[in-house]
Amino acid sequence: MDPYKYRPSSANNSPFWTTNSGAPVWNNNSSMTVGTRGPILLEDYHLVEKLANFDRERIPERVVHARGASAKGFFEVTHDITHLTCADFLRAPGVQTPVIVRFSTVIHERGSPETLRDPRGFAVKFYTREGNFDLVGNNFPVFFVRDGMKFPDMVHALKPNPKSHIQENWRILDFFSHHPESLHMFSFLFDDLGVPQDYRHMEGSGVNTYMLINKAGKAHYVKFHWKPTCGVKCLLEEEAIKVGGANHSHATKDLYDSIAAGNYPEWKLFIQIIDPDHEDRFDFDPLDVTKTWPEDILPLQPVGRLVLNKNIDNFFAENEQLAFWPAIVVPGVYCSDDKLLQTRIFSYSDAQRHRLGPNYLQLPVNAPKCAHHNNHHEGFMNFMHRDEEVNYFPSRFDPCRHAEQYPIPPCVLTGKRDKCIIEKENNFKQPGERYRSWAPDRQERFICRWVDALSDPRVTHEIRSIWFSYWSQADKTLGQKIASRLNVRPTM
């Protein structure tokens, strides 16, 4: 069934003004009244329709990633990885797949400035011949927590105070003082990378661990990385204040204007691979979303390029109604047992159904471009015209059959039901290595940002001491420097 065939036609193809039902409107300037100065009549259907439609223009904003901008383009394979995956869209160099990409800030509201210190979303929807593939990531390769059970509380802590609606450091530092796994993410967020110059000069990452499966059924863990061809650029504090003060939508404008001018942004896609049989060789768990995979041991392998060469036609239809879901994969790609990814698989689709309705995948921007067939019928805002008589399976009256079986990871799981943490936490090694890799001036800016955050008057001595301890375990001199700036002697 073609989801585009029965779309409502655009109102712009009429030479005159009409109501939603197509009736001609001869006056769109005045309400119907009794005489010149009398009361407005309820029978003025056009007025009622116009106001009722206006009252419902806004839909619930995303609980995270509310502020965003989208663009369209293509992904082209440049390197053969068929030994790793049987995914059709990766079948050979030169193959192109249409995409739509949404960039976003994470925590703040839909109209917030794009210069705030905040992670950035980097989500790509591939419209492949075997269905859509949503690679839903961020600009940082790690995350704050490794188990989705903590995600709602984490977002609550990062969001504004429910009493004052002000984002406050004491709430953030209090919550994450219970989660030393967050140190690695903070080594990115409080670094210079914390405020990208714009979306074009920003890296992307799939963040979670996925799996690639080849035709023989061999599976590998995989991490996805996007590298901008124009380089990475960021804004320091004074620059961010200046840019944000002049235009709170500067990154959206930069993306739109660049594409309109023919200066198409481009990213190279790289992957890192781990054989699941070798996962015990590392001092970290490959399914731990708070860890990066060392590139000197697990080098980046080139796959293809992403080019954005077309602006969206309508912001609401192709940005606000654009919906991603990490569970949407294609044959040859599979979700791993990464705890955060497993919870995202449920949460994203549940949020989209709340925000857009149960048939959100029928919206043109979310619908697959390839032929598709199932018995998912009816529900709120179902606008697919279907005339079949058989809406069950199997049936001798419907020739539709099962697709050809494709490989999935052949893993065998044993264990008892439990709520537990992973064995290899190793929370301090990677953030310490990252800090020591910076030049002294970059280290100094990082320290100043932490001093500023810990200077919040509602941050208690206990919370400060915990953070001094954490950063001392990552790098002994770092914890000491932060403590000395606050005139506090660290406990270790």
UniProtKB/Swiss-Prot annotation:
- Function description: Occurs in almost all aerobically respiring organisms and serves to protect cells from the toxic effects of hydrogen peroxide.
Enzyme Commission designation: 1.11.1.6
Q: How does it assemble?
A: Homotetramer.
Q: Look up and give the organism this protein is from.
A: Nicotiana plumbaginifolia (Leadwort-leaved tobacco)
Q: Return the GO cellular component terms, semicolon-separated.
A: peroxisome; plasma membrane
UniProt record, GO biological process: hydrogen peroxide catabolic process; response to hydrogen peroxide
- Give binding positions for heme: 348
Query: Is Ligase among this UniProt entry's keywords?
Result: no
Q: Which cofactor does it need?
A: heme
The protein's induction, as recorded, is: By 3-aminotriazole.
Primary place of residence? other
The protein's name in its UniProt record: Catalase isozyme 3
Family, per the entry?
A: Belongs to the catalase family.
Q: Which cysteines are joined by disulfide bonds?
A: none
CDD domains attached to this UniProt entry? catalase_clade_1
Q: Which residues form the active site?
A: 65, 138
Top-level division of the source organism's lineage: Eukaryota
The residues forming the signal peptide are none
By which gene is this protein encoded?
CAT3
